[in-house]
Amino acid sequence: MQNRVILTLTVLLLAAGGLLPLVNFAPNRLVSGRGIGLAELLSGARLLLLLPALGLLALSFVAPTRVRYLIVLLLAEGLLCGLLWLAGEGARELAAQGGRLVRTSFGSGFWLMAALCLLIAAEAVGRLTANPCLRALGNGQLWLPLALLLASGRLDELSLMKKYVNRAQVFHQALGEHLTLLFGTLAPALLIGIPLGFVCHRSARWRPSLFAVLNIIQTLPAIALFGLLIAPLSGLAAAWPWLREWGTGQRG
C-alpha cells in the first residue's frame, strides 16, 4: 500500500457511489421525491465514467512519482466533471419524460463524491509541489472545466439552475451586497493590519502594548456571538440613522 490517503478517499468515493443517490427526482417541488443512484444512470458508454475511479484505486497501490500524482490529479478532475455531467444529463432525461414541473437536484452521493474528488486532487497537488502559489493554481484550475460545463447549458434542467434563472435578479443583488460587505471589511483590515504587523515584527518596545489592544479587540466577535452587542448597536443606530443605512441594527 503506497498511498493510504488516496486509497481511503477512493474507497469512500466508491462506497458513496454505490450506496447513496447521485440525484433526487421529484414530479414537482412540493414533494420530496426519490433518490436515483449511479446504477440507474450508468449504461452504455456512460460506464466509462467508472474508469477514473478504478484508475485512482489502482494508482494508490503503486510507487508514487510526480508523473503518477499528475495522473491522479487528472483522474480526480475528470471524475468530478463526469459526475457533474452525468447529473445534468440525468436531469435532462427526466425533464423530457416528466415535463417542465419535474425537479431534479443533486443527491447526497453527488455532494460526497464531489468533495472526495476535490480532496484527492488536493492531495495530489500537495504532493506535486510545495510552492503555495503553484498549489493555489493547481487547485484553482479544477473549477475551469466545471465552469465550462455550466456555461454549455448541460446543467440547465437541474433544480438549482432553474431556481437561479427564476430569481437571477435577487441572486445578483444579494451577491453584490455580500461582496460589498466582504471587501468593505477586508480592505480596511489589510490597511490597518499589515502596518501593525510590520511594527510588531520590527519593534519589541511596541509589541506588548499593541498585542494588549489587539487582544481586547479580538474579543468583540465572541461578545457579539452571545448577543451582547445587540443593545449597544441598536442604541447607536437610533442615535445616528446613517449607521442603520450601513447595516447596523439589532444584530450581534
Label each region the model flagged.
Residues 1-177:
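N-terminal, non-cleaved signal-anchor transmembrane helix
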Residues 173-252:
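Membrane-water interface segments at the C-terminal ends of transmembrane alpha-helices
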